[in-house]
Amino acid sequence: MRVGVLAIQGSVREHIEKLKLIDGVEAVLAKDKNTLLSLDALIIPGGESTAIGKMIVDFGLKDAILKLNERKIPIWGTCAGMILMAKYIVNDDKVHLGIMDISVKRNAYGSQLDSFKTKLIIPAVSNNEIEAVFIRAPYIENVGNGVRILAKHQGKIVAAQQDNLLATSFHPELTDDLSFYKYFLRLNS
């Protein structure tokens, strides 16, 4: 299975390293339209959502990502990637991809200094607790019909799925746990 990580900015290397640990996965740096369109799944990493969103347009990648979604190819956004996928961003008129029926609040957990780790119980993903790293993290304020809430932290939605789309506020690539990767890859079957 060819799994790409949108290689514009952010935690690209960390996602690639995790994907390399999973049997049957070819980890691909996705930097251009042709590479994107050849993928079986795509991860949009954390980083700076405004910068990544601008570069997606400037590099001509937006249409390719939208085509992947039309083809129901699994797409997973972590942190900034979740913001890019959201149909609505609280207090911001700018929508980047707008492919997932969620409303996201940017930097909802505060500044870099407010970053934290916690353990989450997410039965759909793992029978074990999952370590979650939140860095200037957003959360999901509202979900539309057809969006499944996978996890909450302190009453706030931090992981959700809508058909082929997966979004997490936190960074699984910064832990040793591959549970979320394996869950994501099952969306392809």
UniProtKB/Swiss-Prot annotation:
Catalytic activity from the UniProt record: aldehydo-D-ribose 5-phosphate + D-glyceraldehyde 3-phosphate + L-glutamine = pyridoxal 5'-phosphate + L-glutamate + phosphate + 3 H2O + H(+); L-glutamine + H2O = L-glutamate + NH4(+)
Coiled coil ranges: none
GO cellular component, one term: glutaminase complex
EC numbers for this chain: 4.3.3.6, 3.5.1.2
Alphabetical list of SUPFAM superfamilies matching this protein: Class I glutamine amidotransferase-like (SSF52317)
This protein's pathway: Cofactor biosynthesis; pyridoxal 5'-phosphate biosynthesis
Pfam families reported in the protein's UniProt record: SNO
Gene3D superfamilies assigned to the protein according to its UniProt record, in alphabetical order: 3.40.50.880
Active site, renumbered: 79, 171, 173
Family note: Belongs to the glutaminase PdxT/SNO family.
Free-text function comment from the UniProt entry: Catalyzes the hydrolysis of glutamine to glutamate and ammonia as part of the biosynthesis of pyridoxal 5'-phosphate. The resulting ammonia molecule is channeled to the active site of PdxS.
Subunit structure: In the presence of PdxS, forms a dodecamer of heterodimers. Only shows activity in the heterodimer.
Name of this chain's protein: Pyridoxal 5'-phosphate synthase subunit PdxT
Protein source organism: Thermoanaerobacter pseudethanolicus (strain ATCC 33223 / 39E) (Clostridium thermohydrosulfuricum)
